[in-house]
Structure formats: structure tokens, C-alpha cells
Amino acid sequence: MLIIISKSDNYYRLGIENMEVYLDNNATTMVDPKVYDAMKPFFCDMYGNPNSLHKFGAGTHPKMVEALNYLYEGINAADEDDIIITANATESNNWVLKGVWIDLILNGNKNHIITTEVEHPTITATCKFLEDQGVSVTYLGVNDEGTIDASSVRNAIREDTALVSVMWANNETGKLFPIKEIGQICKDNNVLFHSDATQAIGKVIVDVQD
């Protein structure tokens, strides 16, 4: 990287040449050194399966419980049944949408899902798959501020609406969506509500009881 500072017409100008800037940290970012130091023992020394009966697993099990309790407290979960641990957000989103499809659509009388045009690809791709299976999907557009109005969700709900899926924080713009208001609308209309809150965790207060 080459930084050039020059003075012209009593103004200083800063020039940067051959500089690479990584702008995808919301998707994947480097591990914080403090996190690396905290996890290193479990990569090299305490690597036993925490659910195993042997002593190597018994040594790691308390640490797993400690981490889970930290997670429960961080989102104000009432008990461990409020959380289902999955491998990643992709698995979680697929699990929810396809689970609703099987339970309420294939085995019920509801055939409609509402989502937005700016969801993460794990949502939009799954919705496209469900459309191929005959599910009706409504994609709501965003307003001038890059988010959606809760009223647009209310207006899109039909008698056969099974699920509303709206992200909390957009992974590209960082815009927050009014999920509390949307959730109340869904509750009032007896519609399931799902939010991909992946980008909100660690950035805003998350309270699953709120």
C-alpha cells in the first residue's frame, strides 16, 4: 500500500494506491484474537466429544454447558427448549421453511408464504424451491429507506398464509426491519413468523421474550 499526501491550493490531499479493502465482514470475518485464545484449548487439548461417556468427553462437557448458558442468557431464553442448535444459518432457515411446508402446507390447508425481495439467498432459494412444489410466495419490496413497512405484511396476509419470513438486519445494507411489529401482526392473524436474525446477533440487543 502506498499513501501519498500532497498540498495544493492550501488543501492537503490524501491518495491511496494499490490498496485492497475487504468489505464482506458481515459474511465472513477474521477470528478475534481473544476468541482464538479462548478456543485454542478445544482444538488442541480438550477435543473430546462433550456428549461421550469417556473421560475426554467428560472434561469438555462442563465447558459446553457453560457456553450454552452464556448463549441462553445473551438472548434471554427462558429455558433450553427455546433454542435448537444447528450447524449454521443455512440449515436453520431450511429447517424452518421446509418444516412449515411439510406441517401446514402438505398436511394442512395453507399454501402461502410471505417474505421480502432482499432476504438472504438461503431464504429466497428455499422459497423458489417451495414455489416449484406449488407453494404461493409473496415477495415484498423495500421502501426508500431499504426496509419494509409492517403494514405491507398486514396487507399481504391471506386466509391461506402459513408463514411470514422477514430478516431482522440486512446482511448487505445493515438496515433493521420492524420485526416486533411484524411479529405482532402475525400473532393477531394466527400466522407463524420467522426472522433470520443472523446479522443482528452481537450488534443489537436480542431478547426472545420481547
Please provide the spans of the model-predicted regions.
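Pyridoxal 5′-phosphate
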Residues: I4-D210
